[in-house]
Regions:
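N-terminal Sec-pathway targeting helices
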Residues: 15-30
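Short, surface-exposed, charged/polar-biased interaction segments
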Residues: 20, 77, 89, 98, ...
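Short, low-complexity N-terminal intrinsically disordered segments enriched in polar/charged residues
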Residues: 26-119
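Surface-exposed polar/charged interaction patches
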Residues: 91, 99, 119, 134, ...
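Acidic, glycine-rich loop-and-strand cores that form catalytic or ligand-binding grooves
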Residues: 117-169
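Low-complexity, intrinsically disordered terminal/linker segments enriched in charged
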Residues: 149-241
Length: 241
């Protein structure tokens, strides 16, 4: 059950191997956005971004896929987050290698990474989708190898549930869009200190009938490096690097 001001932000916990960095950067943010806006609102009008956030958290608590689909464009959110995150990854691959020389995954160049990402994009987005399926439907039994990976990632995500709190800092509206600012804070545990603080900005877009949908993260550039550091630190914490 999601609680006021508290839920997960899985950071690097769902890293299974270095190839998974591309998809993990996205899955981490998606689950964070779905799960961390667990805030209590006063009753609000239906056609407001605050109402949409309230319905999202209710849908997560109730495992209500139909309601979640009304207020979160999961495919658009996954694709946009993946594309921005992997574009930064390819662009900054040499910088990442300098920061983390022990990580063989960063020992490539931009051209290689661009091709690698293009080849993996469809499979990675499918894995992200299945990870979210298993996160919201924990009793589902994995069947395929991809299911097994996604199930493991979803379980690792849940392992972080008690280590992060989230607070809605504000909502700014501009025409038919709104930006929700969410401040995320880790506790004093090893997991909580993987990314001690992070501010995520999520865009909600008003639909034709007036209701708002969560569609993308707007500050991917800003949060990329703290998340990568969290992934690397998790890897070290587990003794795998």
């Amino acid at each position: 059950m999601l609680r006021f001001n508290q839920k997960i932000f899985p950071k690097g916990a769902i890293l299974m191997n270095h190839k998974n960095l591309l998809r993990i950067l996205t899955a981490t943010l998606l689950v964070a956005i779905f799960a961390t806006v667990g805030l209590v609102y006063a009753k609000t009008a239906e056609r407001t971004p605050e109402y949409a956030l309230e319905k999202i958290i209710q849908a997560v608590n109730d495992k209500d896929g139909a309601t979640l689909a009304r207020y979160v464009d999961a495919d658009a959110l996954a694709a946009a987050t993946y594309d921005e995150g992997t574009a930064i990854l390819a662009r900054d691959i040499e910088k990442l290698h300098a920061l983390y020389p022990a990580d063989w995954f960063f020992r490539h160049d931009t051209a290689f990474m661009t091709n690698y990402i293009a080849e993996r994009r469809t499979d990675d987005l499918a894995l992200i989708s299945r990870t979210l399926d298993f996160y919201f439907h924990p009793s589902e039994t994995p069947v395929t190898r991809v299911d097994g990976n996604a199930h493991w990632l979803a379980n690792e995500t849940r392992a972080f549930e008690d280590h992060y709190t989230a607070k809605l800092a504000g909502v700014e509206e501009n025409g038919n869009t709104a930006i929700a600012t969410i401040d995320i804070t880790g506790d004093a545990s090893d997991y909580g200190q993987l990314v001690p603080t992070l501010t995520v900005q999520a865009e909600l877009t008003q639909q034709a009938d007036g209701h708002y949908m969560l569609t993308r993260i707007t500050n991917g550039e800003e949060i990329f490096y703290p998340i990568v550091k969290g992934i690397e630190d998790y890897w070290t914490l587990q003794g795998w690097q």
